[in-house]
């Protein structure tokens, strides 16, 4: 599985993606690709990324469907109840941003995003987190920065994920990360497709399946049935 920005398919008039796909196919992979949005998989972040999946076996694979809106986490769900004052911006910054806010009556909570032109737009979700882009300066309610835990939650990390580095590194790590629920959903469909392929006798020549090869190379335990339900 590979992940990249959604514009990969348009880069160099589509030639970059074409070369990647053709190279994977020459290596023997059956390739599937689709742009998925993290918003559709349960996190309050508009993060559109192309996911490229390859199989050495000719399996019948489909990308996962978006989850129901009722099951998606909202911004309210991921915000911490108590936040240290160090995350709050100076009054001058807050007042300046509110003055430039396009919709001054936008309901809270919201995340505002300052683009390259200095325009500030509120949304009920985060834009795609970035590793170090000052042009994507996000604030919650134009009052404070997201905490480390909130940044991780925006990417779908569980709360038992330990924070052992300072804020700047968490910001960089979450900006470089994939959205966990998206990758989990795709991986679940990959496992289901491979399982179905082999249950229907797709591997009749006696060779090891991709699942078996993965488990052997990683010394992994057999994949439990609940992973493909």
Stretches found by the model and what they are:
Residues 1-46, 50-55:
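Conserved Class I SAM-dependent methyltransferase catalytic core
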Residues 23-27, 35, 45-229:
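S-adenosyl-L-methionine-dependent DNA methyltransferase catalytic core
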């Amino acid at each position: 599985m590979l992940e990249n920005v959604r514009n990969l398919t348009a880069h160099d008039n589509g030639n970059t993606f074409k070369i990647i796909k053709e190279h994977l196919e020459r290596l023997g992979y059956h390739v599937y690709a689709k742009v998925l949005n993290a918003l559709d998989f349960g996190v309050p972040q508009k993060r559109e990324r192309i996911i490229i999946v390859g199989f050495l076996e000719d399996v019948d694979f489909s990308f996962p469907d978006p989850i129901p809106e009722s099951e998606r986490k909202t911004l309210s769900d991921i915000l911490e109840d108590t936040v240290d004052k160090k995350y709050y911006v100076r009054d001058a910054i807050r007042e300046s941003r509110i003055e430039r806010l396009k919709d001054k009556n936008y309901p809270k909570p919201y995340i505002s995003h300052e683009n390259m032109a200095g325009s500030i737009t509120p949304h009920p979700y985060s834009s795609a987190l970035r590793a170090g882009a000052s042009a994507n300066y996000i604030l919650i309610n134009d009052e404070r920065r997201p905490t480390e835990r909130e940044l991780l939650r925006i990417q779908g990390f569980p709360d038992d994920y330990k924070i052992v580095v300072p804020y700047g590194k968490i910001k960089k790590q979450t900006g470089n990360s994939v959205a966990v629920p998206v990758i989990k959903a795709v991986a679940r469909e990959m496992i289901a497709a491979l399982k179905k392929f082999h249950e229907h006798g797709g591997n009749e020549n006696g060779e090891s399946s991709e699942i078996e090869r993965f488990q052997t190379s990683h010394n992994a335990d057999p994949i439990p049935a609940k992973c493909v339900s």
